[in-house]
């Protein structure tokens, strides 16, 4: 099974890349975690934001295979505790499909991406900076794996 974070935005600060890679390398090879960056369209004051969101959404969906699972990160998604995420991770492993976690740009996800979601996940009711979300997803997936494997990290 593969875990893939598909996120709008590239050229993240070094601390974001290091944080993401730290958790990705901690996971076992049978639970490989990959990052796919979708370039953020430059927003000017007269930008057609709706068109940019649609283009970013199309680019995100183009990275997803036909039978792969999509989990969107949305403020109105379902909040999961660590234990609930571990249960979901275990279900996903049994399903053995690639799981794609979709993180939109500053204005959020395209409606087309949300419509394709198998699940909607909310990390918090707070608005979080997108670079930090990458690290949080990586850490939470690693933490969920440690719960399933009895590793002491979660204690």
Curated annotation (Swiss-Prot):
Major site of localization recorded for this protein: cytoplasm
| EC numbers for this chain | 2.1.1.177
> Kind of enzyme, top EC level?
transferase
The record's catalysed reaction(s) read: pseudouridine(1915) in 23S rRNA + S-adenosyl-L-methionine = N(3)-methylpseudouridine(1915) in 23S rRNA + S-adenosyl-L-homocysteine + H(+)
Gene3D superfamilies documented for this protein: 3.40.1280.10
Q: Which GO terms describe its cellular component?
A: cytoplasm
Record-listed S-adenosyl-L-methionine binding positions: 73, 104, 123-128
NCBIfam families assigned: PRK00103.1-4 (NF000986), tRNA_RlmH_YbeA (TIGR00246)
Task: Write down what this protein is called.
Answer: Ribosomal RNA large subunit methyltransferase H
Q: Which organism is it from?
A: Pseudomonas fluorescens (strain Pf0-1)
């Amino acid at each position: 099974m593969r875990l893939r974070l598909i996120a709008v935005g590239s050229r993240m600060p070094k601390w974001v890349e290091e944080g993401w890679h730290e958790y990705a390398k901690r996971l076992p090879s049978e639970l490989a975690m990959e990052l796919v960056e979708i370039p953020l369209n430059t927003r000017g004051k007269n930008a057609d934001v709706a068109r940019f969101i649609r283009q970013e959404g199309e680019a995100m969906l183009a990275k997803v295979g036909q039978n792969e699972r999509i989990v969107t990160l949305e403020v109105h998604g379902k909040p999961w505790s660590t234990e609930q995420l571990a249960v979901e991770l275990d279900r996903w492993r049994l399903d053995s499909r690639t799981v794609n976690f979709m993180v939109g740009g500053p204005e959020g996800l395209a409606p087309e991406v949300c419509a394709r979601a198998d699940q909607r996940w909310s990390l918090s009711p707070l608005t979080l900076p997108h670079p930090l979300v990458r690290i949080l997803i990586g850490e939470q997936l690693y933490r969920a794996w440690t719960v399933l494997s009895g590793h002491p990290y979660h204690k």
